[in-house]
C-alpha cells in the first residue's frame, strides 16, 4: 500500500503504526523496505557524506527501483561550509549509485550572508546560522515529500541516545 496523503495527523499515525510494526530493533534494510512500500516515490534519503552507507544499504534493500520512481532520491544539504573532498564524495556517491540527487543550498551564499548579517554568523549566533543554512533550505527541499530517511546515530549525542527508529517531525 502506497500512502498518498499530506494530512499531518494521518502521516503522524502512519509513523506511529510503522514504529509499532517494525519495533525498535528493526534493521536498516527492514526500515528502508517498509519506507519504499509505504511511501513509494514520495520519500527521500537525507544524507550527508558520513551517511553514505545509508545510500548503499537502500540501494541493496530496495531491489525494485520502479517502486520508488526508478531511482533512489537523496538530499545533500550544501551549507557552503563543506570541504572540497566532501563535495567530491557527494558527486562520486551520486554517480556510483545512479541517484536522483537533490543538492540543497541556502538562499544566500556564505559571502552574501556575511554582507547581510555580518561575518562568521556561526560564531556570533549559531542558532540563526543553522536556521539560515540548514533548517530553512531543508524545509523547502522536503516539502514535496511525505517522508524522509536520515542517518542520525544514537551515539552522536546524548539527545539522540533514545532516538526512535521512526518518528514524525512536525518541524519539517
Predicted regions mapped to residue ranges:
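ATP-dependent adenylation/nucleotidyltransferase module used to activate substrates
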Residues: 2-172
Amino acid at each position: 500500500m502506497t500512502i498518498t496523503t499530506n494530512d499531518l495527523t494521518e502521516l503522524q499515525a502512519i509513523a506511529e503504526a510503522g514504529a509499532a510494526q517494525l519495533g525498535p530493533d528493526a534493521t536498516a534494510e527492514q526500515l528502508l523496505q517498509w519506507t519504499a512500500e509505504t511511501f513509494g516515490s514520495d520519500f527521500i534519503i537525507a544524507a550527508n557524506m558520513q551517511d553514505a552507507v545509508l545510500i548503499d544499504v537502500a540501494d541493496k534493500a530496495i531491489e525494485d527501483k520502479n517502486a520508488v520512481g526508478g531511482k533512489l532520491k537523496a538530499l545533500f544539504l550544501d551549507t557552503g561550509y563543506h570541504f572540497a573532498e566532501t563535495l567530491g564524495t557527494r558527486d562520486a556517491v551520486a554517480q556510483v549509485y545512479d541517484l536522483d540527487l537533490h543538492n540543497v543550498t541556502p538562499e544566500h551564499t556564505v559571502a552574501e550572508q556575511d554582507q547581510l548579517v555580518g561575518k562568521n554568523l556561526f560564531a556570533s549566533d549559531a542558532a540563526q546560522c543553522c536556521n539560515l543554512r540548514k533548517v530553512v533550505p531543508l524545509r523547502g527541499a522536503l516539502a514535496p515529500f511525505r517522508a524522509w530517511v536520515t542517518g542520525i546515530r544514537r551515539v552522536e549525542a546524548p539527545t539522540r541516545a533514545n532516538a526512535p527508529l521512526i518518528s514524525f517531525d512536525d518541524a519539517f
